[in-house]
């Protein structure tokens, strides 16, 4: 085995270093197989009882979480907030108070803004722009401004660009 140490020759000068090497050889170097076992920290007695009864710790998804195509991959992220269409005379506060999955209006507007950033759609404004040319449909209720576009419609299909493996490297002059 070889060790290398760097020892400064003078404490005031950091530019001069003295290198010394020590060689230590051992003739009986036998590798020892080892097993590392990891255990969690001690848990309170109540948690240990739950684990022993067969209730192992696992993620419990709520009923409104979507199972992506039945593959066991669940996700709670959604692009747009879906609001059921209501008759014109209904109060929006009654239906929202009974629905536990709806959130406050600040979160809705944040989710809506994120939807528009991801999809490239312009959000509706308070001036009443309807963006009919871009294919978006807005609801007649000014409080309910959600993105109801198809998200899949593109005006023109562009020619696919080559990926990194298909591009030729740029040559630089002088090399």
UniProtKB/Swiss-Prot annotation:
It holds the Pfam family PPI_Ypi1. Signal peptide: none annotated. Keywords: Nucleus. One of its GO terms (cellular component) is nucleus. Residues 127-141 have a biased composition (Polar residues). Residues 148-160 have a biased composition (Basic residues). Residues 1-175 are annotated as: Disordered. It is found in: Nucleus. Residues 90-106 have a biased composition (Low complexity). InterPro entries: PPI_Ypi1. This is Type 1 phosphatases regulator ypi1.
């Amino acid at each position: 085995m070889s060790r290398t140490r760097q020892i400064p020759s003078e404490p005031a000068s950091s530019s001069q270093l003295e290198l010394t090497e020590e060689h230590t050889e051992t003739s009986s170097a036998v590798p020892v197989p080892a097993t590392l076992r990891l255990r969690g920290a001690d848990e309170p007695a109540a948690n240990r009882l739950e684990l022993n009864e067969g209730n192992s710790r696992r993620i419990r998804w709520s009923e409104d979480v979507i199972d992506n195509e039945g593959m066991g991959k669940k996700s709670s992220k959604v692009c747009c907030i879906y609001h059921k269409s209501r008759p014109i005379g209904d109060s929006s506060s009654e239906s929202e108070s009974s629905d536990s999955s709806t959130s406050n209006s600040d979160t809705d507007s944040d989710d809506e803004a994120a939807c528009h950033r991801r999809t490239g759609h312009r959000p509706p404004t308070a001036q009443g722009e309807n963006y009919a040319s871009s294919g978006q449909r807005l609801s007649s209720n000014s409080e309910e401004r959600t993105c109801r576009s198809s998200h899949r419609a593109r005006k023109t299909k562009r020619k696919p660009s080559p990926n990194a493996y298909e591009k030729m490297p740029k040559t630089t002059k002088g090399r």
